[in-house]
Amino acid sequence: KYASNADSMKIRACYNSIPAQLAKDNKKFQYKVVQKGGSATLFGASIEWLNLAGVVLKCQRINQAFEPIAVYADLSAFKLYMGDVGLLTMKSGISQQTVLSGEGNTFMGALTENYVAQQLAAKGYDLYYWESSSTAELDFVLQKGSQIIGVEVKKGEHVRSRSLSVFVSNYKPAYSIRLSLKNFGEKDG
């Protein structure tokens, strides 16, 4: 479906805000980043258009991680990732040298998280993230059959994650996943 001129300006504004949205400590989508005084009423249809077109990946917040996970989605809270991490790299203006070295840049965490979102979506997973009363946040929560799986993404080799520990303690999943630059390993808990 083609968008009107007025709608296309809102769509573009939402799309252009994604690097800034992901650069924040709290990556939850905020309409005020798109435009001062922005709201779901003003930009909600634009975000839906981008999502349905496959240009962005919408990751809904859940406050509980039980099967079926979709019924625990908070439709008012979400993150938006670019549908292609290469587009995020280009839109953010981060240099190739910084990406290749992977060091000393806080935006590398956003790129890494976007890459994981893209790969999970390509494998057919619906994207959710978990937040516990604003004290802990887990990057992704997946449902595979009847299993709920927590996924924590770390940009470097520092792998300590209080959020993943809180998630595991609360929900006792069969397993959880921590992605980082460290070599693959398996550990109880």
Task: Name each model-derived stretch.
Residues 66, 146, 158-161:
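A short local loop/turn or secondary-structure capping micro-motif enriched for an aromatic residue
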Residues 1-142:
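Accessory nucleic acid-recognition modules appended to NTPase machines
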